[in-house]
């Protein structure tokens, strides 16, 4: 039940001062389809879902599904630290036509590994579309252990994991335990090729917001056996990637997009404008990559 192979953009949400800029969202979606993005992830971390109202999230997901119109998969962020809310949002997302859901581990209240299994099972048992688990312990304080993922192998709708732990050894252990049962997507743009080398299926990418073709090419060069080409793309984009995470994501990527004349709009508090020194570093890397003058 694989959803996509290659590069899914973790899409920013373009805002106006008081809402979502749907005109700009449409332009971004069309641009990504034209520039080889393989799937759209909407209302995730990079999309600032945590500072959007429920109605805004629903309107944005529905608009994305309607605009993309099955040309590439649309994956909606539907998770929270409340199991009932996660289930309800996932049921709603399936009804309006998303191709899959991205479900983060519960945060703040955290739970145990047993609680994780029960949380994800509740979502699995209430929908019939693919589920990607999202493991990002640096944000949630909770790590999905390889053994825990293996214990969920019989939950038929759980098809993949977005691995943003940064722990290559853990990802190798996932592959060793689970083999081909789950797709593994890199959640870190500086680890795309390393995770592909462990049998990964692609990336859910922040970097693809500004260079989608390159991230797609990195993945498909690897899939086609052109591993040196893929590695060179990984290394060539490393400095730019580092700049995009010099402050909390999505502060730098949204700043970069505004510098590139996308109408990404403002960040929502508590996210704020970049420190001047970090902004200059970002500008230097954007210039170095030929994206701005």
Curated annotation (Swiss-Prot):
UniProt catalytic activity: L-aspartate 4-semialdehyde + pyruvate = (2S,4S)-4-hydroxy-2,3,4,5-tetrahydrodipicolinate + H2O + H(+)
Site (Part of a proton relay during catalysis): 45, 108
Superkingdom in the source lineage: Bacteria
Subunit note: Homotetramer; dimer of dimers.
EC number: 4.3.3.7
PANTHER family (UniProt xref): 4-HYDROXY-2-OXOGLUTARATE ALDOLASE, MITOCHONDRIAL, DIHYDRODIPICOLINATE SYNTHASE
Pfam families per UniProt: DHDPS (PF00701)
Stated role: Catalyzes the condensation of (S)-aspartate-beta-semialdehyde [(S)-ASA] and pyruvate to 4-hydroxy-tetrahydrodipicolinate (HTPA).
Name of the protein: 4-hydroxy-tetrahydrodipicolinate synthase 1
GO cellular component: a single term: cytosol
Main location: cytoplasm
A biological-process GO annotation: lysine biosynthetic process via diaminopimelate
Disulphide-bridged cysteine pairs: none
InterPro entries linked to this entry: Aldolase_TIM, DapA, DapA-like, Schiff_base-form_aldolases_AS, Schiff_base-form_aldolases_CS
Keywords tagged on the record: Amino-acid biosynthesis, Cytoplasm, Diaminopimelate biosynthesis, Lyase, Lysine biosynthesis, Schiff base
Pathway: Amino-acid biosynthesis; L-lysine biosynthesis via DAP pathway; (S)-tetrahydrodipicolinate from L-aspartate: step 3/4
Active site: 134, 162
Similarity comment: Belongs to the DapA family.
A GO term for molecular function: 4-hydroxy-tetrahydrodipicolinate synthase activity
Enzyme class: lyase
Cellular compartment(s): Cytoplasm
Keyword Cytoplasm carried by entry: yes
Residues involved in pyruvate binding: 46, 204
Residue runs in coiled coils: none
């Amino acid at each position: 039940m694989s959803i996509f192979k290659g590069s899914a953009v973790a899409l920013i949400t373009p805002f106006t001062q008081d809402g979502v800029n749907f005109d700009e969202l449409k332009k971004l979606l069309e641009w990504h389809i034209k520039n080889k993005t393989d799937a759209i992830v909407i209302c995730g971390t990079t999309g600032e879902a945590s500072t959007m109202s429920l109605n805004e999230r629903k309107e944005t997901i529905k608009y994305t599904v309607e605009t993309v119109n099955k040309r590439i998969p649309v994956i909606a962020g539907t998770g929270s630290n409340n199991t009932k809310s996660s289930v309800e949002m996932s049921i709603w997302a399936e009804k309006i036509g998303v191709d899959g859901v991205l479900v983060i581990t519960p945060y703040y209240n955290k739970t145990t590994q047993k609680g994780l299994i029960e949380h994800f099972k509740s979502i699995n048992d209430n929908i019939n579309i693919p589920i990607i688990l999202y493991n990002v312990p640096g944000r949630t304080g909770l790590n999905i252990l390889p053994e825990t993922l293996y214990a969920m192998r019989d939950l038929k709708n759980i098809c993949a994991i977005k691995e943003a732990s940064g722990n290559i050894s853990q990802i190798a252990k996932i592959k060793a335990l689970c083999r081909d049962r789950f797709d593994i997507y890199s959640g870190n743009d500086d680890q795309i090729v390393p995770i592909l080398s462990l049998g990964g299926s692609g990336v859910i990418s922040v970097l693809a917001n500004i260079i989608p073709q390159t991230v797609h090419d990195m993945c498909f060069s690897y899939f086609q056996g052109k591993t040196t080409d893929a590695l060179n793309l990984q290394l060539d984009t490393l400095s730019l990637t580092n700049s995009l995470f010099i402050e909390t994501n999505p502060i730098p990527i949204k700043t970069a997009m505004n510098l590139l004349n996308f109408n990404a709009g403002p960040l929502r508090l508590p996210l704020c404008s970049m420190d001047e020194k970090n902004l200059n570093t970002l500008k230097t890397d954007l210039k170095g990559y030929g994206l701005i003058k």
